[in-house]
């Protein structure tokens, strides 16, 4: 009967959203009944038969769990034939299972020396070397094994995992090729999963999606040991990160179905549903988790995000409060709770909560920043300036705080100071679209308007954020001022397309059409402006809040 040696367990991991490969390093088994390859110098046929019998008896003892007897039998075989490959291999496995890696390596090395042309002996030696952390030597053994026999799934998988752990593009491409070769020889759901993982790590989204389909088919039909719920949750999170939403939903759903208390998997599945625009499923999932007794801060925080996204602030605020209560040392939750209160026109409540939080986090730049926003919203301008200044003292790269200080100075007519602050914000974060817009807004208020510079910053703002309607409107007004009527019309029309209720855009576009002698269009556009003008005050407040939100959402 053909028997495989017990697998040597060793695990190789990779770092991508805590994602790991799930299979172990494997050892190629020797067969108790195959012709033995060992030196026979000075050994007669009776000794050879005795050695074969001892090895076969030892293998049977291992099958019955009698390791002590098996070890004695294999050692007796080696006392007769010190180069017996199978005896060394079995003793290597026994030593490995006992945690004696050095003894295991000695036996596997002896087997490889005794039969240097044996692919399985090379593979076994490589596996134990890897377990000892001798990666380079292990790779050499696997490469030699594959030169002797290129169609060994175990050696291909082992070498692929080493290349994968190298984590360079070249190593990852090599790993992908090795996994593909192994899969073509012996299709397996764990190798299929590894192909998905490797493609994700290489940023090959389309290939990862294709590999995932094969993996999903194989894992659904696999018998016996399956991928663990934790491993499925890890893969689902990586798929979500790669924006493979459909695949993420499928994998995370399987993880949650197998482990309904895995909070992180539940939260990620809710995110995947939201990414798929399935808000109802996300809400049901999170609310059901709470109803089932998962009283966890992560769940409440995810619920708060969901409620906020659909305009249910009355539900978002208590959910975020519960997240803070369950995890009071989470600075991020305190910050988000404060912003929720500010966004729902409750700055005074935010001030109270932030003053409770700051003694716990006295050096938190973003909590000082949030306090400044709340104070600014509560018209405590001096106090807000002090809070923003404190945020910048803690974190000189706090671009949003610099921008707010610029706004305060601009409102008080200190334009040079405002310009300097906006420039600092941009120098700190060149991708800060709102700061480019705010700087341009001040530049056009100077007695000597710097039109080219303002235009440059407005265009940059729109490159960074095409949805920044205020910048588009301001750019159109610059064009109109300089009689670039066609360009102005384009910007105003784009602003109206982005926000059909933007009254000022209709007014400016009507003026532009009039100058272009497009009288009928001018009259229609100005009529729309008059209809919307009654809501102008409310609209201005909405625009102001939108700008404040953009500033608050920029990460430190």
Question: Where are the regions that the model predicts?
Answer:
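Long, contiguous interaction/recruitment modules in multidomain scaffold/adaptor proteins
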Residues: 2-9, 13-47, 157, 193-197, ...
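Terminal, low-structured helical/coil segments at or just beyond the last alpha-helical repeat
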Residues: 34-42, 194, 214, 226-229, ...
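Alpha-helical segment of the N-proximal tetratricopeptide repeat
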Residues: 49-80, 97, 234-241
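Helix-start (N-cap) detector for alpha-helical repeat units in TPR-like alpha-solenoids
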Residues: 51, 85-86, 119-120, 153-154, ...
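Structural signature of tandem alpha-helical TPR/SEL1-like repeats
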Residues: 63-73, 97-110, 132-144, 166-181, ...
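Structural marker of alpha-solenoid helical repeat scaffolds
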Residues: 80, 114, 148, 184-185, ...
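Canonical tetratricopeptide repeat
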Residues: 90, 124, 158, 194-195, ...
């Amino acid at each position: 009967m053909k028997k495989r040696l017990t697998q040597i367990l060793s695990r190789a991991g990779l770092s991508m959203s805590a994602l790991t490969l799930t299979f172990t390093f494997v050892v190629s088994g020797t067969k108790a009944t195959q012709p033995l390859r060992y030196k026979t110098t000075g050994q007669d046929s009776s000794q050879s038969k005795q050695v074969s019998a001892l090895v076969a008896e030892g293998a049977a003892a291992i099958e019955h769990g009698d390791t002590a007897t098996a070890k004695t039998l294999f050692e007796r075989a080696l006392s007769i034939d010190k180069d017996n490959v199978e005896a060394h291999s079995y003793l290597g496995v026994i030593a490995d299972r006992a945690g004696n890696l050095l003894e295991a390596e000695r036996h596997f090395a002896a087997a490889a020396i005794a039969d240097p042309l044996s692919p399985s002996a090379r593979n076994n030696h490589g596996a134990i070397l890897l377990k000892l952390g001798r990666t380079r030597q292990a790779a050499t053994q696997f490469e030699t094994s594959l030169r002797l026999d290129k169609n060994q799934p175990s050696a291909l998988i082992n070498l692929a995992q080493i290349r994968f752990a190298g984590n360079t593009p070249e190593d990852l491409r090599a790993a992908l090729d090795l996994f593909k070769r192994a899969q073509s020889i012996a299709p397996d759901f764990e190798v299929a999963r590894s192909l998905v993982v490797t493609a994700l790590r290489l940023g090959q989204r389309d290939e990862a999606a294709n590999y995932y389909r094969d993996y999903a088919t194989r894992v659904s039909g696999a018998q016996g040991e399956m991928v663990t719920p934790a491993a499925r949750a890890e893969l689902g999170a990586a798929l979500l990160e790669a924006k493979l939403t459909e695949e993420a939903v499928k994998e995370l759903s399987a993880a949650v179905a197998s482990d309904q208390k895995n909070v992180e998997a539940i939260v990620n599945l809710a995110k995947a549903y939201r990414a798929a625009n399935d808000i109802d499923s996300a809400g049901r999932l999170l609310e059901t988790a709470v109803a089932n007794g998962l009283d966890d801060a992560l769940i409440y925080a995810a619920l708060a995000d969901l409620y906020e996204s659909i305009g249910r602030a009355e539900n978002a605020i208590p959910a975020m409060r519960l997240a803070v209560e369950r995890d009071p040392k989470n600075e991020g939750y305190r910050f988000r709770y404060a912003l929720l209160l500010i966004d729902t026109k409750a700055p005074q409540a935010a001030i109270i909560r932030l003053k409770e939080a700051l003694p716990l986090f006295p050096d938190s730049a973003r909590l000082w920043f949030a306090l400044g926003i709340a104070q600014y919203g509560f018209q405590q301008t001096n106090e807000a300036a002090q809070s923003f200044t404190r945020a910048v003292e803690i974190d000189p790269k706090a671009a949003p705080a610099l921008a707010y200080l610029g706004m305060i100075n601009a409102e008080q007519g200190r334009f040079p100071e405002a310009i300097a602050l906006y420039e600092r914000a941009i120098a700190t974060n060149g991708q800060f679209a709102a700061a480019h817009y705010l700087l341009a807004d001040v530049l056009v208020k100077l007695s000597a308007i710097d039109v080219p510079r303002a235009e440059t910053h407005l265009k940059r703002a729109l490159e960074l954020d095409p949805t920044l309607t205020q910048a588009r409107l301001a750019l159109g007004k610059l064009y109109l001022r300089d009689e670039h009527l066609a360009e102005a019309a384009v910007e105003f029309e784009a602003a109206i397309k982005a926000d059909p209720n933007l009254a000022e855009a209709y007014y400016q576009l009507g003026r532009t059409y009039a100058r272009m002698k497009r009288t009928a269009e001018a009259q229609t556009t100005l009529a729309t402006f008059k209809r919307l003008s009654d809501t102008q005050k409310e609209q201005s407040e909405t625009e102001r809040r939108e700008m404040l939100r953009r500033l608050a959402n920029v990460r430190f």
